């Protein structure tokens, strides 16, 4: 699967899509592939504040439990409730159906510090 050019990426394999003064966050195709079949996703509540580089949830696969690290700071304004009943969406549609949270940014400049698709591809040895 190709790496979408319209997103930014963290070194912890989260993607970020800018929508006005907010961002949508999910995990990358590379990350879901490393984790294997996702069986449970734990996400914060709407209204929670998340801090960049701090855990904001977790993803449980048949192999392991992995924490999700916030690529930016802000207030959670939406959570993808579908992942509660359909965690497999993370494997099936990491960039579309499996978005995890929408966050109102506290510092928009944090997005610019994230990796471009090209840099993320280099980091993960993907073309």
Swiss-Prot record:
GO terms for cellular component: cytosol; glycine cleavage complex
Modified residues (N6-lipoyllysine): 63
Chain ranges of the Lipoyl-binding domain: 22-104
Entry keyword set: Lipoyl
Superkingdom classification of source: Bacteria
A GO BP entry: glycine decarboxylation via glycine cleavage system
UniProt cofactor(s): (R)-lipoate
Cofactor note: Binds 1 lipoyl cofactor covalently.
UniProt xrefs under PANTHER family: GLYCINE CLEAVAGE SYSTEM H PROTEIN, GLYCINE CLEAVAGE SYSTEM H PROTEIN-RELATED
HAMAP family the UniProt entry points to: GcvH (MF_00272)
Oligomer status and interactors: The glycine cleavage system is composed of four proteins: P, T, L and H.
Function: The glycine cleavage system catalyzes the degradation of glycine. The H protein shuttles the methylamine group of glycine from the P protein to the T protein.
Family annotation (NCBIfam families): gcvH, PRK01202.1
Similarity section: Belongs to the GcvH family.
Name listed for the protein in its UniProt record: Glycine cleavage system H protein
